[in-house]
Swiss-Prot record:
This is NAC domain-containing protein 2. Residues 7-158 form the NAC domain. GO terms for cellular component: nucleus. The gene is NAC002. It comes from the Eukaryota. One of its GO terms (molecular function) is transcription cis-regulatory region binding. Interacts with KIN10 and KIN11. It is found in: Nucleus. It holds the Pfam family NAM. It comes from Arabidopsis thaliana (Mouse-ear cress). Keywords: DNA-binding, Nucleus, Transcription, Transcription regulation. The NAC domain includes a DNA-binding domain and a dimerization domain. InterPro entries: NAC-dom, NAC_dom_sf.
Length: 289
């Protein structure tokens, strides 16, 4: 609504408390004209505070209104503070405006959403300016609920945002109304654990895989700093074949599968605890990788 006002470029409306009372409220109550009608006239207590910025004639972070006040009780002097879906609650002490004799009174109020006295406090603040020493006995004799003709109110949100209660409004694109859906965080499944093979592959042309990269002969023993036990070398398949050919024997070690002993390895008469060609390989396969 500010585009309806003929204001000069760079105009800002930041009046002091004295200016609001002396130059605006006093003239309004006296039915005198105001040079620039920059303050709207509404019944402020019929609206929620977040609806008021759209009803103001001017304002960016603060909005000003002339509003009447009604009595809470027909025979009392307390104002009715119910407004929209909640109520305004006074906070702090009243501040007199004007020296040496106060001309107006400033009162601070906070808006609570819901029914009193269990409403939820919001960040909406109102500074209400009223004239001091006003005789309201005439209106009381007429049994009127009107307490004051006009008070001047400054409305603002102390967090600088026009917060509102209730669900957010739908987003409008052209002629279509699209509802905002809640954002759901995408669940990312963790990668499957890598499975290690339980089987070892032996190439007949080479020896059993080694735990270290340095090649060793059958007579070398290499101790890695990563292991506390020794790593024994593995016999080559070609060595076993040579032994077998020299003895005119195949790789038949006479292994007794019942009592797990070698009866006659390579045709010899040695006992079962003597060395035989597969001992190194069996010991290697029993060690954990």
């Amino acid at each position: 609504m500010s585009e309806l006002l003929q204001l000069p470029p760079g105009f800002r409306f930041h009046p002091t408390d004295e200016e609001l009372v002396m130059h605006y409220l006093c003239r309004k109550c006296a039915s005198q004209s105001i040079a620039v009608p920059i303050i709207a006239e509404i019944d402020l207590y019929k609206y929620d505070p977040w609806e008021l910025p759209g009803l103001a004639l001017y304002g960016e972070k603060e909005w000003y209104f002339f509003s009447p006040r009604d009595r809470k009780y027909p025979n009392g002097s307390r104002p009715n503070r119910s407004a929209g879906s909640g109520y305004w609650k006074a906070t702090g002490a009243d501040k007199p405006i004007g020296l040496p004799k106060p001309v107006g009174i400033k009162k601070a109020l906070v808006f609570y959403a819901g029914k009193a006295p269990k409403g939820e406090k919001t960040n909406w603040i109102m500074h209400e300016y009223r004239l001091a020493d006003v005789d309201r006995s005439v209106r009381k004799k007429k049994n009127s609920l009107r307490l004051d003709d006009w008070v001047l109110c400054r409305i603002y949100n102390k967090k600088g945002a026009t917060e509102r209660r209730g669900p957010p409004p739908p987003v409008v694109y052209g002629d279509e109304i699209m509802e905002e859906k809640p954002k759901v965080t995408e669940m990312v499944m963790p990668p499957p654990p890598q499975q290690t093979s339980e089987f070892a592959y032996f190439d007949t042309s080479d020896s059993v895989p080694k735990l270290h990269t340095t090649d060793s002969s059958c007579s070398e023993q290499v101790v890695s700093p990563e292991f506390t036990s020794e790593v024994q070398s593995e016999p080559k398949w070609k060595d076993w074949s040579a032994v077998s050919n020299d003895n005119n024997n195949t790789l038949d070690f006479g292994f007794n599968y019942i009592d797990a002993t070698v009866d006659n390895a390579f045709g010899g008469g040695g006992s079962s605890n003597q060395m035989f060609p597969l001992q190194d390989m069996f010991m290697y396969m029993q060690k954990p990788y």
